C-alpha cells in the first residue's frame, strides 16, 4: 500500500522565511576542511532544530535582536561558524542568523526540497517499489546517506529518497 505523507506545506515554510530568495549552496568547495573553533567539528555541517519555537538572531548573543522565530522542530540547518555558545546557521533558502547551541541537536533530518513531491523507495534504486510520497516541505529523519540515496523515516514509514530531492546533506557526504 502506498502512503502519502502530508506535512509542512511550502506556504507554511515560506511564512517563516518570506521575502528571502533561495541561494544555491555552492560556496563550500574548499580544499581543506574547516573546523569549528569551539567544537572541532567540521564546518559547514548539518544539524536539526531541537525544539520549536527557536529564535534566529542577528548576532551571537541574546543582546542581538531576534530576526526570525522558527516554528518547526526537526528542521535541518547548516552550521557555518561557531562563536562561544552560538552557531551561525543557514536555512534551506539561504537565510542566515545565529542560534544558541542548546536549540540545535546533532540528529540528522532532511527537508523535501524537490519540485512537487519526493518518492520514497524500498531500496536505494529508482526501479524499486514505491513505499510513499512526501510533499515539498516535509521533514524526514535521516538514518543514513549513501552517494546518491538517503535512507529516511517519517513516523512508521521508512524508505530511500534520492539526494536530489532533499536539502540537509553535503554533496559528497555519506554517513550511517
Regions found by a protein language model. Give the residues of each.
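Positively charged n-region of N-terminal signal peptides that target proteins for export
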Residues: 1-5
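Bacterial N-terminal signal peptides
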Residues: 7-22
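Short, solvent-exposed loop/turn positions at domain surfaces
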Residues: 64-65, 125-128
